[in-house]
Amino acid sequence: MREIFDLYSYLKISGAQAAGRRLKAREAGIHVPVFLQADISVHCNLSCPGCENGYIHTKHQEELMTVNEWDVLFREAEKLGIRFFFLTGGEPLMEREILERAARYQNSWFLVFTKGTLLNEEYDQFFSDHRNLVPMLCLDACSDINLEKMGKSSYLYESLMYSMDALSRRDIVYGTSVTLTGENRNRVLTRGFLDGLNRRKCNGVLYLVRDEADGHGAGHGGGNPAWDGSLRLTEEEKEEVKENLKELWKDYHDMVLYTLSRSGHFLGQPFEKAEVYRVSAEGNVYNSPAGLEKLGNLREKDLRSILQR
């Protein structure tokens, strides 16, 4: 198989300094997560099941974090030892200025979760010029999740395939994300599914898992009606997912294959103990993507103070 970007190898080789900073911070009573999700956008040109936008409810524009405030967050987080950011929304590509600020932090990786419909020649060049920003194409549009409720499923599928081909032609590092359900897991956790992505030079898949955290997080407010308890995996199904991934790793060792739950936990090695915190569009800092516990607000305290235990 071809050699492509491997997240785990990057962490082992280039993450030593960041790990050292996190350890130093921990000794000072500051609990720094490995990953930080940042809801940089509340706007989106689509409405699809599984979208994080269903968890963001902001009434007024003035409540949102400004470009400069996001810049300050990225800088402080990097100093504390956070090297991996999940830029979510909404549609992050609608916040070009924030992405340009993120691109300045060359020692960090920013995974940009996008539907792909706004990717064009200009954005392809932008990602080519700023290799620390990694497009993550959301494949829920073509993974058999409530397609009858989407309306634009055919358009989204064609757009995603076009975006993959455009990114691969420029040799841009990119990944995909898909929400695992009891209905689709036997299709998206297969060699056939991964072979199709591999042929398009996809560098990895992040499988998102709904769990007990759904419905209990801050800002849920009913969320997206397409999501309900029926889409969550049972504990038995989660164990099967772990075993399937172990087998797939053997054949796709040059692809990044991980699962992440809404409670902020990875299923299986090597990130099983890594934590994912979240910063909402209003600057609230939570201890998980689902927003189970609010730790503070960045307009009242800086990140270091909020993470102080």
Residue ranges and their predicted role:
Residues 2-125, 129-130:
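Conserved alpha-helical substructure of the radical SAM core
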Residues 83, 133, 203:
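Conserved acidic residues
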Residues 136-140, 144-274, 278-295:
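Radical SAM enzyme [4Fe-4S]-AdoMet core and its adjacent flexible, acidic
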Residues 80, 106, 130-131, 170, ...:
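Helix C-cap/helix->beta junction micro-motif
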Residues 19-28, 32, 288-309:
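Flexible mid-to-C-terminal extensions adjoining Fe-S/redox cofactors in radical SAM and related proteins
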Residues 96-98, 122-123, 146-147, 217, ...:
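Short glycine-/acidic-enriched loop or helix-start segments at secondary-structure transitions
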Residues 92, 119, 180, 210, ...:
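Hydrophobic pocket-lining residues within nucleotide cofactor-binding pockets
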